[in-house]
Amino acid sequence: MVQKVVVIFSGGMDSFTVLNMAVKEGYEVHALSFNYGQRHSKELDYASRACITLGVAHKIIDISAINELIGGSSLTSDVDIPEGHYAEESMKSTVVPNRNMILLSMAVGYAVSLDANKVYYGAHSGDHDIYPDCRPEFVERMNDVCAIANYEKVEIVSPFLYQSKIDILTAGLNMGLDYNLTWTCYNGREKACGKCGACQERLEAFDKNNAQDPLEYE
C-alpha cells in the first residue's frame, strides 16, 4: 500500500521543490494550499497549475477570515512591502503572527483524516532570522505536540530546515524541475517586483547556481 503524505504547498519554489521530492519518493501526495488573505494570492494560481502538471491531488482552503484576528503583517494588511534582503530588520513586517502553527495544525488534521503519517513544509535556514515559526526548535516542538494531540502519530518533516534557498534550488535543478511553475514575489502584480526580500533571495539563489530564472520581472 502506497504511503500517503500531505505537503503544504504555497506555490513558491521552496514548497514546489519539497512537493516534487515527495512525488519522486513514491508517496501518494496530497498538496494543501491556503488563502490566508495574502496580497500575493497569485501564488495559489501557480500552485494549482503545478499540481495539475504533476497530477497531484490538491486542495486550496480559504482561511482569510483569520485576518480579523491576526492583522498587521505587510503580507496581509495595508502596509507597504519592504524592499531588500531577508536579513534586514524591516523584513520582520512580513511576519504573519502564528501563521505556520495554524497552517501546520490544519495540515496535521488533514493528514489524520487521510491516514497519512507525514506533513511536509518548506522551511529553510534563510527563514530562521526573520520567521520564528521556521526555526528548528519550532519544528521540534510542533512534533512534540503532534505526538500527543491525536491518537494517530503524524510527523512534520522539513527536508531543507538546515539548508538555504541556494541549496533548495540546487536540488531542484538536479531533479530537472521547471521553476516557471512557481511564484515567489510578495507583491501580487503581473510581474515579480525583483525588489522585495522574497524576490531578492530567489534571484540570489539562481545567480549562485549560475542559472537563469524563468520568471519575468518588472
Swiss-Prot record:
It comes from Pseudoalteromonas atlantica (strain T6c / ATCC BAA-1087). Catalyzes the ATP-dependent conversion of 7-carboxy-7-deazaguanine (CDG) to 7-cyano-7-deazaguanine (preQ(0)). One of its GO terms (biological process) is queuosine biosynthetic process. Keywords: ATP-binding, Ligase, Metal-binding, Nucleotide-binding, Queuosine biosynthesis, Zinc. Zn(2+) binds at C185, C193, C196, C199. Its cofactor is Zn(2+). HAMAP family: QueC. CDD domains: QueC-like. Pfam families: QueC. Its EC number is 6.3.4.20. This is 7-cyano-7-deazaguanine synthase. PANTHER family: 7-CYANO-7-DEAZAGUANINE SYNTHASE (PTHR42914:SF1). ATP binds at F9, S10, G11, G12, M13, D14, S15, F16, T17, V18, L19. NCBIfam families: 7-cyano-7-deazaguanine synthase QueC. It comes from the Bacteria. Binds 1 zinc ion per subunit. The keyword Transferase does not apply. The gene is queC. The keyword Ligase applies. One of its GO terms (molecular function) is ATP binding. Belongs to the QueC family. Pathway: Purine metabolism; 7-cyano-7-deazaguanine biosynthesis. It catalyses: 7-carboxy-7-deazaguanine + NH4(+) + ATP = 7-cyano-7-deazaguanine + ADP + phosphate + H2O + H(+).
